Curated annotation (Swiss-Prot):
BP-aspect Gene Ontology terms: intracellular protein transport; melanocyte differentiation; melanosome localization; pigmentation; protein targeting
Biased amino acid composition, Acidic residues: 154-172
Residue ranges of the region described as Disordered: 147-182, 215-276, 311-335, 361-472, 485-590
The UniProt record lists the keyword NAD: no
Species annotation: Mus musculus
Domain RabBD, first and last residues per copy: 4-124
A cellular component annotation (GO) from this entry: stress fiber
Low complexity compositional bias, start-end: 391-401
Role this protein plays: Rab effector protein involved in melanosome transport. Serves as link between melanosome-bound RAB27A and the motor protein MYO5A.
Assembly behavior: Binds RAB27A that has been activated by GTP-binding via its N-terminus. Binds MYO5A via its C-terminal coiled coil domain.
Domain of life: Eukaryota
Zinc finger (FYVE-type): 64-107
Protein name in UniProt: Melanophilin
Biased segments, Polar residues type: 215-238
Amino acid sequence: MGKRLDLSTLTDEEAEHVWAVVQRDFDLRRREEERLQGLKGKIQKESSKRELLSDTAHLNETHCARCLQPYRLLLNSRRQCLECSLFVCKSCSHAHPEEQGWLCDPCHLARVVKIGSLEWYYQHVRARFKRFGSAKVIRSLCGRLQGGGGSEPSLEEGNGDSEQTDEDGDLDTEARDQPLNSKKKKRLLSFRDVDFEEDSDHLVQPCSQTLGLSSVPESAHSLQSLSGEPYSEDTTSLEPEGLEETGARALGCRPSPEVQPCSPLPSGEDAHAELDSPAASCKSAFGTTAMPGTDDVRGKHLPSQYLADVDTSDEDSIQGPRAASQHSKRRARTVPETQILELNKRMSAVEHLLVHLENTVLPPSAQEPTVETHPSADTEEETLRRRLEELTSNISGSSTSSEDETKPDGTFLGGSPKVCTDTGHMETQERNPRSPGNPARPTKSTDEELSEMEDRVAMTASEVQQAESEISDIESRIAALRAAGLTVKPSGKPRRKSGIPIFLPRVTEKLDRIPKTPPADPDDQAKMPKATTAVPSLLRRKYSPSSQGVDSGSFDRKSVYRGSLTQRNPNGRRGTARHIFAKPVMAQQP
């Protein structure tokens, strides 16, 4: 890009946006500079106090070098500073664990100023990036915003940022030395300076109307308040002449400022080097205040005539031919549209950085409350559905068993669509609730379906947790058996089904109808139903009246082993059970 910056093709909204961002940047820099100046004043006071105490070195052995309090053994111990090697008390020192020592308050403040000013960083930026600055942006935008009520920035403000440029810095320093009432010298300076001529070639935008002279005193007073220089009649006489000339030149321009080609933009490195800087250097002084007309400008339609070269136009005989040649050059230039997109991206990045800096520098009461953006209901529903699909796919093995268990209860029959691992099948079932395969199912809202899916997922997760607890219980039993010296070797063959029949409720009802006392006659015993004969002797003994008062502990096993049910005697089983254990669990001799 070089030394040229043309923002004349920006719309009014974009120009206001850029102006507001740059003003926030200046405001934050000024606040940081004021804070650092206060710290510098404290350092100067402490240094003067230290000079007075330097003559009495013996006094520092017994008293603090800062507050002159006497040292005490436990209450107010003596500590030596790492920088100045003076002794200070406990309340006047700061601990530095990384250096394993102490610093007195003046030395600590000096370090804070050195780190907070970032002088080393800005020196590196000035040495590397020399072609862009916030002063150029303000100089390019001040004409448009001045017409809508905004004030023109002072020369000192432009000089604060123009230290990062080569020839632009020389221009700003020379312009600051010149008083505002010497219009002839300013005219000669503007024509002799080549850089300002190149910049002023791009600082004019077509307009639809001529600016009135009523805004001239306001701009002059605002210029006086910002720059601190006296206000004179020569400046007001200079500005109407410039307004008349610019109005005459604007008659042949295009009427609409919104249909304009895009402007050349600064490179990415230069933009971030200047606009992303959080605080100004210690050498640059920002004596400006926030622009008073920026709030009023946003609610109005601003005229788009630039006043950047008003100061350089006070004689029609000299400026007239030059203005015609400049207009012919401006019409011939075309700029790609990609650069305006790059500027928008950079300005958004600068805005994010400025918000972060405002949160750091400004107090919490001055910060505006942030507006939370709530996602739409469709987005929340989509994310919740996606999470439910992930959960159901993770526990697909246990979800099928949970559905089989819930079928006898009748809880989920005829309810919401079945949770499947195939997400596509589930979505088709949800979208077509009245499909031919499921005609009787009532239509339900999305919230009900999601709640049912959540209940089903929770039930499946609880069943998985219960199965895991059972597995851990079995593993603990196996570990206990192994700790007892037993080797458990599971058989590779499938388990043999238990020979003990499982009786349904019908069988228990028939058991209630069985006579209390079994018939002694074998003929009557043969007439009993088959279910009664199928009951083993254990159940018969349980339901018989003779066993009601007998304790269950008096039951006699036929096997010689008396142990727990998990440790069965392999000798009492048939031949297929010998493969389960390699040796008997425990053999007790009778």
